[in-house]
Amino acid sequence: KEGYLVNKSTGCKYGCFWLGKNENCDKECKAKNQGGSYGYCYSFACWCEGLPESTPTYPLPNKSCS
């Protein structure tokens, strides 16, 4: 699946400023706890592709970003 990476404790997206190819987003996406294949910055948040179905993405159910 694909989607915005989400911080499980805050319910917020992973923010980014360098749009498009983004090393930080790519690294976060490919981290063992996320399991994605490619990440980049889209609309100032990290978008991730190739995620396993088990990885939560934004928005988290019952948790709004605060």
Curated annotation (Swiss-Prot):
It is found in: Secreted. The keyword Acyltransferase does not apply. It comes from the Eukaryota. Keywords: Disulfide bond, Ion channel impairing toxin, Neurotoxin, Secreted, Toxin, Voltage-gated sodium channel impairing toxin. Disulfide bonds join C12-C65, C16-C41, C25-C46, C29-C48. InterPro entries: LCN-type_CS_alpha_beta_dom, Scorpion_toxin-like, Scorpion_toxin-like_sf, Scorpion_toxinL, Scorpion_toxinL/defensin. Residues 1-66 form the LCN-type CS-alpha/beta domain. One of its GO terms (cellular component) is extracellular region. Expressed by the venom gland. The keyword Disulfide bond applies. GO terms for biological process: defense response. Its main location: secreted. PROSITE patterns: LCN_CSAB (PS51863). CDD domains: neurotoxins_LC_scorpion. GO terms for molecular function: sodium channel inhibitor activity; toxin activity. Negative results: does not show inhibition of peak current on Nav1.7/SCN9A (at 560 nM). Beta toxin that binds site-4 of sodium channels (Nav) and reduces peak current (observed on Nav1.1/SCN1A, Nav1.2/SCN2A, Nav1.3/SCN3A, Nav1.4/SCN5A, Nav1.5/SCN4A, and Nav1.6/SCN8A (IC(50)=44.9 nM)), shifts the voltage of activation toward more negative potentials (observed on Nav1.6, Nav1.1 (weak), Nav1.2 (weak), and Nav1.7 (weak)), and induces resurgent currents at negative voltages following brief and strong depolarizations (observed on Nav1.6, Nav1.1 (weak), Nav1.2 (weak), and Nav1.4 (weak)). This toxin is only active on crustaceans. Belongs to the long (4 C-C) scorpion toxin superfamily. Sodium channel inhibitor family. Beta subfamily. Has the structural arrangement of an alpha-helix connected to antiparallel beta-sheets by disulfide bonds (CS-alpha/beta). This is Toxin Cll1. It comes from Centruroides limpidus (Mexican scorpion).
